[in-house]
Regions:
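Terminal "cap-and-tail" regions of soluble proteins that handle hydrophobic small molecules
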Residues: 2, 9-12, 76, 101-112
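Glycine-rich portal/gate segments that line the openings of hydrophobic small-molecule binding cavities
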Residues: 31, 40-88, 104-106
């Protein structure tokens, strides 16, 4: 049997370097992620060991369920960050965000 993996992705109309810089600017995640970020420990740019607290948003409404993201690693050479995410009801998942250049002007951002 062949396993199938489905992960969300986005094509961003910006060069890889710009997308990567935005991904490392954790205090601005709420500007592009469907979440309201409420805490960064330590504050500042993304660093391994940083813990972020957020509430999801749907249709412009902030949900009362909190999520915690634990930044595990930043791989600048491969443009990849790895998070352990504590979801409501005791669910934990590991997620990777990877930036892949398409050409000099666009970047694919792969989540999963």
């Amino acid at each position: 049997m062949t396993a199938v993996s489905v992960c969300p992705a986005a094509v961003v109309n910006a060069p890889l370097e710009r997308v990567w810089a935005v991904l490392l600017d954790s205090e601005h995640y709420g500007e592009w992620a469907d979440a309201r970020f409420t805490r960064f420990d330590p504050p500042g740019p993304a660093v391994p060991g940083q813990v972020m607290s957020a509430n999801g948003r749907e249709f412009g409404i902030t949900l009362p369920l909190q999520v915690r993201l634990h930044l595990q690693s930043i791989d600048s050479q491969n443009h990849r960050v790895i998070f352990d995410v504590d979801l409501p009801f005791g669910i934990r998942e590991r997620t990777t965000i990877r930036c892949i250049p398409i050409d000099g002007r666009t970047t694919r951002v792969q989540f999963g």
